[in-house]
Amino acid sequence: GSEMCIRDSSISPAGIEALTARGCDVSADEVRPEALLLRSAELHGCEFNPELLAIGRAGAGYNNIPIPDCTEHGIVVFNSPGANAEAVKELELCSLVMASRDVLGSIGWVRGISGEGAAIPKLVEKGKSAFAGPELLGKALGVIGLGAVGALVANIALELGMTVYGYDPFMSVDAAWRLSREVLRADSVDDIFRNSDYISINVPYTEQTHHMLNAEAFAKMKRGVRIVNESRAEVVDDEAMTAALESGAVAKYVTDFPNEVILKAPNVIAMPHLGACTPESEDRCAVMAANQLYDYLLNGNIKNSVNLPDTSLSRMGVCRLCVIHRNVPRMITRILDFISDRNINVEHMINKPRDKYAYTIVDLGASIGEDIADSIRAMDNVLRVRVI
């Protein structure tokens, strides 16, 4: 069995069970593991042992993992996108209602009239209008980012009778299939800003999405827009959001990412990163990450990697050669020539590029020894070689 190290006490037991049931050696103190399974353990500044092949993150975000460093060391990093999508969708639904009607404020106010005895019913009738707010029915919701969560939010908003605009320049075929045809496609993010009474942002955090909602964006929106952010803190410029809330340009902001700046702003509902906090979601994330690690260790297949291309091949040969290398010309030719020069037949192969890197799986008609693997390791631009 493969040696796995769990770097987080918060990993769901279901994920660990998915590995131990298949004979993997799982412990929290493995010194030279072949794989790490983690949630929020911080890996920046860590020294990786040379045997480490893969890291599985139980969850979608991966800013606790030094991705470029891992890729250069030939370490595949997996995440589990979509495993917590249902949990986030349900919280976003709750957030849309809270952004509209002051449910939260009303609950606090009712607590405050405890002790008023028989007068409570009258006080309630008199005070309730202060917490009224518009219905979602018939309003326009703009969904920025139509991945696993965004598509679910768009679909459920349609069920509530909202008009839904969706914007996602990088939409996958899978997401397109999941999305209702009634979602209106926005050609630009500005279309979303102009048309929406409510905005839900569901994008990963990248250089391109940094402060996507900034002063310039708020200036293009309908006055009194209500915004929900359960994606990442950094996609919203908090200083600009504070100014927009103070001026009434934004009527309400619901965020899962509290910080000192935003907690001082008016009309904010801030939650303690509750998006994926359900037992079902934590189980799904851990099991998904564990299954992907196992398939990579056993078969060399890559699914849901954040740094290398998704690559899968059904096994056809006696032995499998897996090579992570830089995406440079003639790399595959050099590997295949080297193999055929030793009279070994190639039964099947696949090569996939991703930015500056690529991954090649070759199924061979005969077993190869470590000497051949070492010769391929010694080639320029090769980062990792495995024989399975």
Annotated model-derived regions:
Residues 81-140, 301-306:
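Phosphate-binding beta-alpha-beta segment of Rossmann-like dinucleotide-binding domains, i.e.
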Residues 89-108, 155-162, 287-301, 336-340:
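Oxidoreductase and adenylate-handling cofactor-binding alpha/beta cores
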Residues 146-147:
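Glycine-rich Rossmann-fold phosphate-binding loop(s) that bind the pyrophosphate
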Residues 150-151:
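N-terminal Rossmann-fold NAD(P) dinucleotide-binding loop
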Residues 253, 263-266, 274-388:
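NAD(P)-dependent dehydrogenase/reductase Rossmann-like domain
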Residues 2-3, 7-80, 194, 214-216, ...:
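An N-terminal-biased, well-structured beta-alpha scaffold segment characteristic
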Residues 41-46, 169-261, 277:
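Rossmann-like adenosine-cofactor binding region
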